[in-house]
């Protein structure tokens, strides 16, 4: 069981990707971008769109990419967000794009490599993503 699924707690972050957002796909699975359909594990408030931050699992579809990946709902994890968020040490951090990777429901990646940096909040929470990432910021 070790190494699969989310491990530990995640601090509150600025929510960057509401339902309907499109983000880049940063793995080598063959998908180019991901369309957010739902956010896993969020509470609800009347008339508020669920939104995700780095480290959150979302349900997404592929809008551009390999035909065998398109038109299916699959879980993905957000690894970068362009909206600034505050870390506990007072540093504000943001990336130049929104990006995610396709995973299975247990959190294991479909691809085998991640392009670009990964947020530390995401790498701490998802061990399989941390092991496949090049740079953790």
UniProtKB/Swiss-Prot annotation:
GO biological process per UniProt: translation
Q: What GO cellular-component annotations does this UniProt entry give?
A: cytosolic large ribosomal subunit; hyphal cell wall
Among Gene3D superfamilies, the record links this protein to: Ribosomal protein L14
- SMART domains from the UniProt entry: Ribosomal_L14 (SM01374)
Q: Name one GO molecular function term.
A: large ribosomal subunit rRNA binding
- A Pfam family found in this protein is Ribosomal_L14
Tell me which UniProt keywords the record has, alphabetically.
Cytoplasm, Ribonucleoprotein, Ribosomal protein
Location within or outside the cell:
Cytoplasm
Which InterPro entries does the protein's record reference?
A: Ribosomal_uL14, Ribosomal_uL14_CS, Ribosomal_uL14_sf
Q: Which family does it belong to?
A: Belongs to the universal ribosomal protein uL14 family.
Q: What does this protein do?
A: Component of the ribosome, a large ribonucleoprotein complex responsible for the synthesis of proteins in the cell. The small ribosomal subunit (SSU) binds messenger RNAs (mRNAs) and translates the encoded message by selecting cognate aminoacyl-transfer RNA (tRNA) molecules. The large subunit (LSU) contains the ribosomal catalytic site termed the peptidyl transferase center (PTC), which catalyzes the formation of peptide bonds, thereby polymerizing the amino acids delivered by tRNAs into a polypeptide chain.
According to the record's subunit comment, the protein's assembly and interactions are: Component of the large ribosomal subunit. Mature ribosomes consist of a small (40S) and a large (60S) subunit. The 40S subunit contains about 32 different proteins and 1 molecule of RNA (18S). The 60S subunit contains 45 different proteins and 3 molecules of RNA (25S, 5.8S and 5S).
Q: What is this protein called?
A: Large ribosomal subunit protein uL14
């Amino acid at each position: 069981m070790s190494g699969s699924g989310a491990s530990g707690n995640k601090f509150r972050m600025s929510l960057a990707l509401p339902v309907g957002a499109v983000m880049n796909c940063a793995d080598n699975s063959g998908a180019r971008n991901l369309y957010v359909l739902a956010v896993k594990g969020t509470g609800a408030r009347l008339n508020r769109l669920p939104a995700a931050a780095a480290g959150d699992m979302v349900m997404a579809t592929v809008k551009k990419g390999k035909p065998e990946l398109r038109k299916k709902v699959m879980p993905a994890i957000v690894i970068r967000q362009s909206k600034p968020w505050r870390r506990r040490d007072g540093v504000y951090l943001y990336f130049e794009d929104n990006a995610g990777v396709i995973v299975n429901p247990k959190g294991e990646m479909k691809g085998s490599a991640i392009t670009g940096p990964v947020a530390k909040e995401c790498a701490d929470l998802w061990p399989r993503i941390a092991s496949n990432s090049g740079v953790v910021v």
